[in-house]
Design a protein with these regions (language model features):
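Juxtamembrane segments of multi-pass membrane glycosylation machinery
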Residues: 75-99, 107-110, 115
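Membrane-interface micro-motifs in multi-pass membrane enzymes
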Residues: 124-177
């Protein structure tokens, strides 16, 4: 079970998460902007479908990305386009916020895992998580195709189809490690309910 945190520890974790979020937002807005440009991006930014598997579609199991990407695109049009008057930049802003949020959640979950399971102090878990975060950018420094990073994808669609679901899965595994009682609750459900939940 997760321990209680002191006020100072909460402030440290919130400050750390804010720095990660702002650095990733700056990265995805200025250094590596998430601009829609290819046919997949244009198609899936506005491809609305039912939130259930479509059996005769080419990939019936792709539900989350095909719901989440157009939802983010629609929110961008209603929230940011009235302010920016630029469709492409509105989408890039929303995509940057969404991807930065998921990466922040990922690094935050890793810091909590270090604190709870590895018994690290909050300051040590923040230091280790900072290196963990930075190594995502350093690991491909000598790549022949440029300075790619572990959060790299060829287009915006790949972020929603691969990067975000992978991050979400890692965070869910960490949550199940931190709260093992959740697995007990899940294992007591019947098969149909398990399928609906997962």
């Amino acid at each position: 079970m997760v321990k209680k945190y002191s006020r100072k520890e909460h402030i440290l974790l919130i400050g750390f998460s804010t720095i990660i979020f702002l650095s990733m937002l700056l990265f995805f807005l200025r250094i590596h902007p998430l601009i829609i440009y290819d046919a997949d991006d244009w198609l899936y930014a506005s491809y609305f479908r039912l939130p259930i598997p479509i059996w005769h579609d080419w990939n019936p199991s792709r539900v989350f990305p095909e719901i989440f990407m157009p939802l983010c695109s629609t929110l961008a049009v209603y929230l940011f386009m009235p302010l920016t008057h630029d469709y492409i930049w509105s989408l890039a802003l929303m995509y940057g916020i969404v991807v930065s949020s998921f990466i922040t959640l990922y690094v935050y979950a890793f810091a909590l895992f270090l604190r709870e399971k590895m018994k690290a102090s909050v300051s040590n878990s923040i230091i280790i998580s900072t290196f963990f975060f930075l190594f995502h950018f350093l690991v491909f420094k000598t790549s022949e195709s440029g300075n790619h990073h572990m959060f790299y994808a060829n287009d915006v669609t790949c972020y929603f189809y691969y990067i975000i679901p992978t991050i979400l899965n890692v965070v869910l595994v960490i949550i199940l490690e931190l709260y093992p009682d959740l697995m007990d609750i899940f294992s007591r459900k019947n098969g149909i309910l398990k399928g609906v939940i997962s």
